[in-house]
């Protein structure tokens, strides 16, 4: 899980979602998981 000030899609399978007021990227590739913070 990378924590970044701005989250972006890295590949076509990345999806930007909101969980508990946080913006996150979830993907099939676990290296692409990001959270805004």
Curated annotation (Swiss-Prot):
What UniProt keywords apply to this chain's record, in alphabetical order? Ribonucleoprotein, Ribosomal protein
One example GO MF annotation: structural constituent of ribosome
Q: Name one GO biological process term.
A: translation
Cellular compartments per GO CC: cytoplasm; ribonucleoprotein complex; ribosome
- Coiled-coil annotation reads none
What is any Pfam family matched here? Answer: Ribosomal_L36
Instruction: Establish whether keyword Membrane is in the entry.
Output: no
Which gene carries the instructions for this protein? rpmJ1
Q: Which family does it belong to?
A: Belongs to the bacterial ribosomal protein bL36 family.
- At the top level, the lineage of the source is Bacteria
Q: What is this protein called?
A: Large ribosomal subunit protein bL36A
């Amino acid at each position: 899980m990378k924590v970044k000030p701005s989250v972006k899609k890295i590949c076509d399978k990345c999806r930007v979602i909101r969980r508990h007021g946080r913006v996150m990227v979830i993907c099939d590739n676990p290296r692409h998981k990001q959270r805004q913070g």
